């Protein structure tokens, strides 16, 4: 409907309508006066007959024959070729025979109006078209007009624009506080000028995708009470040279005229990347645009009252001149929300969605660590879609569980049929991941195991921490590598012929091992040094611009260390599965019976599990001996019970995001009936053989340590 009204408002439709009316008028003007059109042959027959005729008129030029038999019978036709000579002779004969009163020939020529119309109509049409094009260029210069490619494409917020407020934003309170202060700057500038404070010229919002950067900007637009100009970074660069800089100038001119005002540039990294990179040189179009942006923000001629808010996912590629104080005075990180933030986000998005009485949003928040606001909104939307698909009145826990699985791993492949052997291999593969994760002390809890195909996986083991973790220890990294290799080790142990299903596990484990050696300085042989430059060329991709800053000999040492770490993790996983073969078989039997096992069901199966001990101390050198003095006790926090039992979730960092992957420890459950000594070492790294569990009738009479004081080999390292 809007497109139709836009078409009828334009002049083009009226021009075409006028031309059509003129053609119709000329058509009807040339006909009429009561004459009936007849074929040429019939007209010639009438003239050659002996009927009495009142008059005949031959009009040259148009070659028209008009025959009047009487007042009620008038005919019109046309002659062709040289018929006129024959017609004239016949008409003269009829006049002599007195069967025709008279005839006349006419050669009137064209009328002056018709001649003018035919000669000048094409020029009139061309002139009207150019007038329309120029009018469109002036009226739509900023919206893609012919002459308006240098105009800004910014959208200006109006009263009719749907508004978001800070009440619609949750999970990033620090960013909200900073942006609310920007709103106060614009509303009450005297309050800040009284103490000598200056209004910030720019605010940069950066963080992972889906954390709410654009939503924060919309909230500022909804509450600022000043004109709000929004534009994407990619809108500045077009096919014409200089368009980007022209649009920057036009954008700031519009904002200055409407000051105080706010400009929001989304994805500013499209124009704000490092200058001098890539193949464009100093005359690259993006560089001209960036230079103009730098001048407008803090150049020679700057007027106050305009605040620039920008958002990006990659602050590392932005030009340093853009980030300095005086341009982007504030740089606000918008990270993935913590537990409390996720709960608030779920409450915001649950508004208007009917929930069952037993739905606990706090439980959903605990089960979704690492998810962004967009992920959580997608979870609730998927749950609502599943509820509507099943024609249910309210959203229940089962729909929310399925929604979480769909967001993490994709929809279930109900039509994919696997034979029993493939299902058995998948069950042992996922069971190997889960068992090794539960046996290692530094892994995350196993939340769910399934052998139902979902997404691109034949099955998956969901491993997530019970609380938010922001770092990882060396022991946790090594344990995570062991559970990543658990699936491959299980296939080798059981089927003696591993499959290709562990390719993604090997990829993840290799990344962890290489980061452990080259980034984190956690290899005793390489030392505490970062190898490999992390700087990248903005126009050459993520890693194409990286340079190796170490020798070939060091590269060989790195490769050897990575291989050794992977081999140790692989062997630890194999030994762990071998020592817990009965538990692994029971887990597979339960997977075949139920197809999906929850956290509580897995904990029940793993009660007799033989768990691996903690790793020994690591300092990277024999010269650095760790202290035996324990750390100080942190101060008491009001409202926190220091003596309350801790939730058994080990620390977890950014290495393994909350995606379906193998592994996990089970917090809060009782240990198995047998555990090796705390300093026991698996045979894979030089330790002794797995000791037998003590006899239940004679507790404490298990195998005794050797007399040399080294009970079961060197501690885990």
Curated annotation (Swiss-Prot):
GO BP, one annotated term: protein catabolic process
Region annotated Disordered, chain positions? 617-717
How does this protein lie in the membrane? Multi-pass membrane protein
Segments in the Extracellular topological domain: 31-111
> Where would you say this protein principally sits, based on its record?
membrane
> What is the cofactor note?
Binds 1 zinc ion per subunit.
The coenzyme or cofactor needed here is: Zn(2+)
* One annotated GO molecular function: ATP hydrolysis activity
Q: Which NCBIfam families match?
A: FtsH_fam (TIGR01241)
Show the active-site residues.
430
Task: Give the enzyme's EC designation.
Answer: 3.4.24.-
Q: Which residues lie on this side of the membrane: Cytoplasmic?
A: 1-9, 133-717
What is one cellular component GO term in this UniProt entry? plasma membrane
- CDD domains recorded: RecA-like_FtsH (cd19501)
- Subcellular location, record wording: Cell membrane
Q: Which organism is it from?
A: Cutibacterium acnes (strain SK137) (Propionibacterium acnes)
Parts of the chain that traverse the membrane: 10-30, 112-132
Q: What does this protein do?
A: Acts as a processive, ATP-dependent zinc metallopeptidase for both cytoplasmic and membrane proteins. Plays a role in the quality control of integral membrane proteins.
**Which of this chain's residues are annotated to bind Zn(2+)?**
429, 433, 505
Pro residues bias: start-end ranges: 691-717
Q: How does it assemble?
A: Homohexamer.
Q: Which protein family is it in?
A: In the central section; belongs to the AAA ATPase family. In the C-terminal section; belongs to the peptidase M41 family.
For this chain, the annotated S-S bridges are none
Q: What is this protein called?
A: ATP-dependent zinc metalloprotease FtsH
Question: What Gene3D superfamilies does the record point to?
Answer: 1.10.8.60, P-loop containing nucleotide triphosphate hydrolases, Peptidase M41
Where on the tree of life does the source sit, at the highest rank?
Bacteria
């Amino acid at each position: 409907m809007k497109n139709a009204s836009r078409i009828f408002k334009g002049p083009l439709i009226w021009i075409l309508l006028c031309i059509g009316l003129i053609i119709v008028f000329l058509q009807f003007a040339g006909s009429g006066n009561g004459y009936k059109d007849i074929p040429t042959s019939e007209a010639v027959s009438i003239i050659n007959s002996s009927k009495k005729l009142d008059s005949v008129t031959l009009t040259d030029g148009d070659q028209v024959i008009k025959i009047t038999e009487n007042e009620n019978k008038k005919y019109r036709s046309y002659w062709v070729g040289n018929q006129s000579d024959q017609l004239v002779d016949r008409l003269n004969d009829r006049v002599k025979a007195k069967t025709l009163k008279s005839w006349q020939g006419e050669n009137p020529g064209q009328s002056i109006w018709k001649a003018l119309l035919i000669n000048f109509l094409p020029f009139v049409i061309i002139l009207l078209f150019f007038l329309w094009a120029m009018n469109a260029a002036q009226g739509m210069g900023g919206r893609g007009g012919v002459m308006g490619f240098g105009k800004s494409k910014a959208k200006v917020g109006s009263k009719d624009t749907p508004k978001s407020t800070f009440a619609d934003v949750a999970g990033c309170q620090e960013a909200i506080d900073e942006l609310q202060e920007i709103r106060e700057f614009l509303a009450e500038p005297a309050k800040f000028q009284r103490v000598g404070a200056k209004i910030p010229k720019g605010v940069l919002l950066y963080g992972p995708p889906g954390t709410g950067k654009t939503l924060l900007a919309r909230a500022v637009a909804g509450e600022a009470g000043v004109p709000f100009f929004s534009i994407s970074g990619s809108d500045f660069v077009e096919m014409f040279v200089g368009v980007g800089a022209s649009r920057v100038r036009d954008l700031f001119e519009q904002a200055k005229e409407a000051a105080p005002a706010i400009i929001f540039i989304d994805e500013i990294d499209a124009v704000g990347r490092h200058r001098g990179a890539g193949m464009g040189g100093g005359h690259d179009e993006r560089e001209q645009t960036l230079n103009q942006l730098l001048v407008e923000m803090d150049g020679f001629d700057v007027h106050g009252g305009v605040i620039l808010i920008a958002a990006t996912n990659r602050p590392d590629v932005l030009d340093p001149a853009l980030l300095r104080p005086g341009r982007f005075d504030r740089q606000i990180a918008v990270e993935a929300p913590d537990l409390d933030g996720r709960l608030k986000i779920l409450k915001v998005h649950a508004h208007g969605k009917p929930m069952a009485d037993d739905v606990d949003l706090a439980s959903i928040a605990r089960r979704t660590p690492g998810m962004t606001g967009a992920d959580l909104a997608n979870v609730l939307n998927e749950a609502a879609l599943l509820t509507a698909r099943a024609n249910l009145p309210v959203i229940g826990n089962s729909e929310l569980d399925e929604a979480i699985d769909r967001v993490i791993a994709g929809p279930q492949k109900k039509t994919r049929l696997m034979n029993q052997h493939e299902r058995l291999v998948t069950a042992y593969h996922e069971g190997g991941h889960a068992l090794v994760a539960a046996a290692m002390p530094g892994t995350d809890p196993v939340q769910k195991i399934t052998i139902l195909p979902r997404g691109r996986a034949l099955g998956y083991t969901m491993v997530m921490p019970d609380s938010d973790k922001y770092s990882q220890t060396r022991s946790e990294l090594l344990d995570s590598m062991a559970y990543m290799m658990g699936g491959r080790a299980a296939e080798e142990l059981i089927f003696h012929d591993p499959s290709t299903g562990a390719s993604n596990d090997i990829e993840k484990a290799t990344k962890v091992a290489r980061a452990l050696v080259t980034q984190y300085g956690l290899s005793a042989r390489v030392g505490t040094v970062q190898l490999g430059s992390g700087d990248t060329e903005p126009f050459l991709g993520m890693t194409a611009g990286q340079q190796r800053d170490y020798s070939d000999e060091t590269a060989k040492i790195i490769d050897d260390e990575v291989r050794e770490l992977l081999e140790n993790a692989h062997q630890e996983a194999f030994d762990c599965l071998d020592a817990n073969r009965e538990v692994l078989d029971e887990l597979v039997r339960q997977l075949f019976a139920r197809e999906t096992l929850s956290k509580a069901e897995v904990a029940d199966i793993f009660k007799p599990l033989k768990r691996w001990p903690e790793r020994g101390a690591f300092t990277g050198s024999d010269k650095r001996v760790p202290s035996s003095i324990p750390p100080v006790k942190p101060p008491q926090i009001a409202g926190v019970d220091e003596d309350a039992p801790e939730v058994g979730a080990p620390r977890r960092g950014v290495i393994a995001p909350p995606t379906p992957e193998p592994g996990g420890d089970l917090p809060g459950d009782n240990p198995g009936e047998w555990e090796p000594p705390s300093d026991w070492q698996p045979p894979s790294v030089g330790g002794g053989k797995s000791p037998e569990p003590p006899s239940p009738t004679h507790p404490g009479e298990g195998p005794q340590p050797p007399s040399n004081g080294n009970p079961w080999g060197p501690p885990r390292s």
